[in-house]
Structures are given as structure tokens and as C-alpha cells.
């Protein structure tokens, strides 16, 4: 059985490589090329976070019932180069929006689909597996369609803000 510490330990070498990089389009492309589906890191960490959701230690706090859950797995610390690690589970066939939020320092978001065709909206379109890397100061609704996904996100300094007003639609 895997544990949160297994996922944290697997993330340390990855975060060592990323500690001086900034979220955005260039990093998103690089993450998908170097660490996307099929890479050793992606497959290992995706397996661990899937185990965590199944076993109840990841994405286990309901935000909007059982279809939208999250949990912080690690606080920012020196060992993680001051990134936090959070898991989010979202499940909806029809497009579904979660809590509007802002990324003061950006976000590195590993998208793990649990159903074929499940996708998460990223800043550059829908992502069915791989990475999104919203820029610093970006803000959005997390949005899923096509089934269940896990979003495992790494936040510089653990910074995320839910204290922001969504734009008028």
C-alpha cells in the first residue's frame, strides 16, 4: 500500500529540477515533453495519487460533495524547494466548474484522467493527461468534463488564493 510520503519522496527529484523555473507556456510544453504520460515520473506519481484517492489519503476532503474533493498532501518546506503538493478529484461528464481561485506564483498541475475522455481545462485548452502550468497571477475556475480526473498540483510557496472575485460573465 502506498502512502503520502511515497508520493512526496517521488516528487523531490522532480522539484529539485524545477526549483528555479517559472510556470507558464514554455514550462508547460517542457513538462509535457519531459514528464508527460509515458514518462517514468508521470506513471509512478500517477499510480501513487490514484492509490491515494482509492485508499482515502488523497483528495479526501469534500468541497462540493463527492464529485469535487481536495487535500493538501505536503506543506511547502526546504526538502520540497518550498513547493506544496495538493491533490484534487473532480468528476463530471458534463462540464463542471470548481472554486474560482488565483495562483500568485503560478502552478504546476499534473492531470491524471481516470476515465477515457476525461479532461481538465488548462490555460491553453483542455488537457486529457499531462501538464498545465498557469502563469503567475493567473486566475480561473478549475473545470472538468468527460468523467473523473485527478489534478496533482505543485504550488510555489504553497500560494493559492480563493479570496478573489470571478469576472462577470
Curated annotation (Swiss-Prot):
A single MF term (Gene Ontology): lyase activity
Family indicated by similarity: Belongs to the PnbB family.
Temperature dependence: Optimum temperature is 30 degrees Celsius.
Enzyme Commission number(s) from the entry: 4.3.3.-
Protein name (Swiss-Prot/TrEMBL): 4-hydroxylaminobenzoate lyase
Pfam families cross-referenced by the UniProt entry: PnbB
Stated pH dependence: Optimum pH is 7.0.
Amino acid at each position: 500500500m502506498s502512502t503520502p510520503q511515497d508520493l512526496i519522496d517521488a516528487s523531490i527529484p522532480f522539484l529539485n529540477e524545477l526549483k528555479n523555473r517559472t510556470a507558464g507556456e514554455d514550462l508547460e510544453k517542457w513538462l509535457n515533453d519531459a514528464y508527460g504520460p509515458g514518462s517514468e515520473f508521470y506513471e509512478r506519481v500517477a499510480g501513487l495519487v490514484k492509490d491515494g484517492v482509492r485508499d482515502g489519503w488523497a483528495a479526501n476532503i469534500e468541497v462540493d460533495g463527492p464529485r469535487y474533493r481536495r487535500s493538501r498532501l505536503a506543506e511547502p518546506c526546504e526538502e520540497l524547494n518550498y513547493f506544496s503538493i495538493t491533490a484534487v478529484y473532480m468528476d463530471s461528464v458534463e462540464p463542471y466548474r470548481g472554486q474560482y481561485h488565483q495562483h500568485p506564483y503560478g502552478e504546476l498541475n499534473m492531470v491524471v484522467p481516470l476515465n477515457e475522455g476525461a479532461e481538465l481545462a488548462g490555460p491553453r485548452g483542455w488537457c486529457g493527461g499531462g501538464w498545465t502550468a498557469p502563469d503567475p497571477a493567473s486566475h480561473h475556475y478549475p473545470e472538468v468534463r468527460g468523467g473523473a480526473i485527478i489534478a496533482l498540483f505543485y504550488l510555489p510557496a504553497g500560494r493559492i488564493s480563493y479570496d478573489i472575485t470571478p469576472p462577470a460573465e
